[in-house]
């Protein structure tokens, strides 16, 4: 199942995506995926960033091939850094670079979205429905 966050008729919705249209989802996608009868075609909506994060924590130089491409070694323990929530863009949106930015690295990213406040989640808790309650 593919889920997207979309803009349709000046409103934001989460929707199930199929080959021809979006089917809107009722309520909170972190609680249950409940489709409604309301739909729109793919061409009628704009695909938005999937979430509106309160913060973004990323890891620098966390894989060897990227480090080698910059004549560096991967960090033994990845270095966390923050990105601003405004750095998230939607499908086909322009990437706007600040003036004098220097170097820009194009990278594929893996993202974890946690739907509740969470702290100190252990590996064994990741696969349970109680993970965000810890």
Regions from the language model: what does each represent?
Residues 20, 86, 115-119:
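Short loop segments at secondary-structure junctions
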Residues 12-13, 64-66, 88-89, 118-121:
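Short, acidic Gly/Pro/Ser/Thr-rich loop/turn segments
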Residues 46-48, 69-71, 95-104, 109, ...:
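A generic local secondary-structure boundary/capping motif
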């Amino acid at each position: 199942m593919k889920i997207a966050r979309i803009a349709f008729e000046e409103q934001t919705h989460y929707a199930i995506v199929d080959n021809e249209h979006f089917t809107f989802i009722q309520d909170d996608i972190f609680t249950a995926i409940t489709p409604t009868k309301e739909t729109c075609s793919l061409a009628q909506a704009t695909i938005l960033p999937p979430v509106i994060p309160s913060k973004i924590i990323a890891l620098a130089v966390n894989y060897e091939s990227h480090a080698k491409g910059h004549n560096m070694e991967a960090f033994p323990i990845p270095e966390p850094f923050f990105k601003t929530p405004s750095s998230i863009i939607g499908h086909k949106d322009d990437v706007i670079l600040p003036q004098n930015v220097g170097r820009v690295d194009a990278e594929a990213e893996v993202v974890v979205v946690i739907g509740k406040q969470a702290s100190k989640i252990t590996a064994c808790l990741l696969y349970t429905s109680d993970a965000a309650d810890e």
